[in-house]
Amino acid sequence: MNDDIELPVDVDLYKQWHIDLIQKHRAESNSNSILFAIENDNGEHVGVCNLYGIDERHGRFEPVGIEINVSHRNKGYGTAAFRMIGRYMFNERRMHKWNSGYVEGNNASAVMHKKLGFIVEGVRPDSIYHDGKYRGEVMCGITETQFFENEKTLPLLM
């Protein structure tokens, strides 16, 4: 059993689906969330990212949902998007802490979080029902200082 949402296969339909999603989000949204499209250097739509749980009072934000088109996965788009989110939220929105997480067994997400300097803070057992069974949710976080220290170790991002 696969509980994932079926996405359009056609690239133009995929892009339109995300445009519709973004427009719907803007119409219903408040300032506690941001939804944006991800494009490659050629202007081709490769995915969408949803940033929500922005807490101005405590200077933190949490989870970021990201969806990269299957044909564009494992090319660094998710990592680049996360880096841009960190720069924006820490520099422009003056946030202090980024709380994130991923489903146990999602190795791509685990590798990305580690590469970006996130620290695993714990696991919520059996918290997410995915692909026919309950899985743990790995909780991790990074502070502004940790994020920018780690950024120094990564290749330049334009």
Predicted regions mapped to residue ranges:
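Conserved GNAT-fold acetyl-CoA-binding loop/helix
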Residues: 1-22
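A short helix-loop-beta-strand connector motif used in the catalytic cores of GNAT acetyltransferases and
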Residues: 21-37
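Acyl-donor (CoA/ACP) binding surface of acyl/acetyltransferases
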Residues: 35, 39-158
